[in-house]
């Protein structure tokens, strides 16, 4: 239980988070803030980090390693058998053996997390501490749970999976900062997530990216007349989105070129908002007749105004524009990699094709984020798109016993 002092402090944080509106497309709407305000936010964020030191140390970033990896690599048919022999003979330690397993990283926003809107206290706690239990990284062996991408990959190979995603994460300029609310819940924007990966000695073999949904709040900062004619605004947002996405992606590619193992990067298009709004409208009707159903449905409208019915059409329109920018961006980057044999970048619309029109796929609390069934559908769709990248990396059902250096990390011994 919390001490009285900690409880009072956190209660104040919850009230602040509830009172202060969320800022989505910050670089378009936010004026420069006074220095004392910036310093106050910095101090408050550091205080929360100090209070939650146990959480920050224990789960930053959340990682899962195949539990029986040692038994699996000890099989002569394993591609990592030679690494296992080196470990048994004392040439490398256990940590180095784990580093030689395939590493997979996930970058994204709240749609890659077990996240939904609830009471401020519950939302804060879950955003800061709740990891796993999502379509990318779920380790629950219960057949009724999510069969995550991590678990599906385990059928082929032992691996290490790490999630860098965070609720509220944006595709924003690296110079924009993460903002106070995002720092409080320990969220990093795309550039910050990329920076985390770039700091690691062991660079991932496979990087999956699904982010941009928080960039869709196109009404933020616009007057009523401007909302009537948003064409210029939407195009500005799409153009800036591509610039801000390209910078961290290029940094990851540049690092990948220096690695002595193959690297595949998969950029996923945004969710199918057209089908999502069909389900949300059903939820709105049910909530109107019985407010206990989808109890936090209105919270989404308050913090993300573009979810409101008058603005949904242009939100869908913007999502398609951003998907087009990502597709074009990846195509250009792929052409630049023509002479690089160890880096592959791919755009996938697999997650954009998930049909969210069914009520059971959206969360029963806020009718905004995916439900458990929604996470199951996303896991199946995402995994179905990984075939070309897994083949490029040499990960698959028909792995042979011969060593595969493209999968092994050969650091200094």
Predicted regions and their residues:
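Structural recognition of the beta-strand scaffold that forms the well-ordered cores
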Residues: 103-115, 161-166, 205-210, 215-217, ...
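Short, solvent-exposed beta-strand-terminating loops
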Residues: 107-121, 269-293
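Short, solvent-exposed loop/turn and secondary-structure capping segments
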Residues: 115-120, 176, 218-223, 277-281, ...
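Conserved SGNH/GDSL esterase-like catalytic core that processes O-acyl groups on lipids
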Residues: 122-250
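A short helix->loop->beta-strand "cap" motif at the edges of active sites that frequently abuts
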Residues: 256-263
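Substrate-gating cap/lid alpha-helix
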Residues: 276-346, 372
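Extracellular low-complexity, Gly/Ser/Thr-rich intrinsically disordered linkers
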Residues: 320-328, 332, 343-395
